[in-house]
Amino acid sequence: MIRQRAWVEIDQAALVHNVRQFRQYVGPKTNLMAVVKADAYGHGAVRVAQTALQAGADWLAIATLGEGIELREAGITAPILLLGGINSPEEIEAIAHWRLQPTLCSPEQAQLFNDILLKLGKVLPVHLKLDTGMTRLGTPWPQAANFVGLVQSLPQLRLASLYSHLATADDPNTATMLQQQERFAKAIASLRQARLPIPKLHLANSAATLHGQAWHYDMVRVGLGLYGLYPAPHLGDCLDLKPVLTVRAKITQIRTIPPGTGVSYGHQFVSEETMPMAVVGIGYADGVPRNLSNQLEVLLRGQPVRQIGAITMDQMMVDLRGIDDPQVGEVVTLIGQDGDRQITADHWASTLGTISWEILCGFKHRLPRILI
């Protein structure tokens, strides 16, 4: 593949390492679900899914119907959980056709699925979601027994799992997380009291998985951790994870500008002395947030260089003072390792007051993904 002005490198060995770290950590009795929604957090869903399954993942999770179809069209046969809400007959028919396993969040949705599947003459495994405190998708946890009982009575549905999602698993204060676990336990107890079957249970995302075995149940759903990032600093010692994604771009022009020269839109940066600068072929249309303008450092020859002026749609400028004889075509590292130095998505997220998930998902498809 031609290395264009900018690209994303995906370290397959690092991904395999991370999957195996989680596989060993949760043990053989707990299923490992690789969360590959949002194009595997910007890493490329098909390749990541294939690699994760080969390395020891048991299940895949996606958020939309289209994401699931993409995996099936690539020949992936592993079980796929669709996390998002589905409520149209056309989508239900497609789910059945592509052998995806949907999340059901309400009795009304369960009835709709059963009605459509009855017309199709198909039976489908389904996963019931309880709201234990996220206040997003799901049936309120006190109604768990009624919900499970209804699904058990619907002939076209096969109960595959019961799960919930944690709102604060990455917070050092675990009070809310523990409250959600207690509610999940009470919901399970209500099934036993009603003499209903207990299906596969899962509660943990990456952060909760790293909290230990008490959170693992029958399966864990690991997203961010697979890609080598920790959900929170206090969880950084739990496993040895390696970042999978690197973002690089080429220098497309080098210039020397005199004192008093404004750089880029709005002249947010004005040179105080004669200085060398470079234009780098990557911008906010590629996923470099414009709000990082004049706050970003990138790596050139393993040395940090400062980004200057407003980041534009397709390009940005960097200060080359301190770099000896720079050349057009040299490669700049925006995220990743160069020599002894490393820049992570966490660095960008901290500067912007956001989360690393958003940074990773922001890298657009016009940046080719190169497997290394």
From Swiss-Prot:
- Which cofactors is this protein said to need? pyridoxal 5'-phosphate
Against PANTHER family, the record matches this protein to: ALANINE RACEMASE (PTHR30511), ALANINE RACEMASE, CATABOLIC-RELATED (PTHR30511:SF0)
Please list the residues that bind substrate.
R136, M313
Cite the entry's keywords alphabetically. Answer: Isomerase, Pyridoxal phosphate
Q: Name one GO cellular component term.
A: cytosol
Its recorded reaction(s) are: L-alanine = D-alanine
Q: Which GO terms describe its biological process?
A: D-alanine biosynthetic process
Catalytic site: K37, Y265
Disulfide bridge positions per record? none
- Keyword S-adenosyl-L-methionine recorded: no
- One Gene Ontology molecular-function label: alanine racemase activity
Does the entry feature the keyword Isomerase, yes or no? yes
What is the protein's name according to its record? Alanine racemase
Its EC number(s): 5.1.1.1
Q: What is known about what this protein does?
A: Catalyzes the interconversion of L-alanine and D-alanine. May also act on other amino acids.
Organism per entry = Synechocystis sp. (strain ATCC 27184 / PCC 6803 / Kazusa)
Q: Which family does it belong to?
A: Belongs to the alanine racemase family.
Coiled-coil portions: none
- N6-(pyridoxal phosphate)lysine occurs at K37
Which InterPro entries does this one have?
Ala_racemase, Ala_racemase/Decarboxylase_C, Ala_racemase_C, Ala_racemase_N, Ala_racemase_pyridoxalP-BS, PLP-binding_barrel
Please name the pathway.
Amino-acid biosynthesis; D-alanine biosynthesis; D-alanine from L-alanine: step 1/1
Alphabetical list of Gene3D superfamilies matching this protein: Alanine racemase, Lyase, Ornithine Decarboxylase, Chain A, domain 1
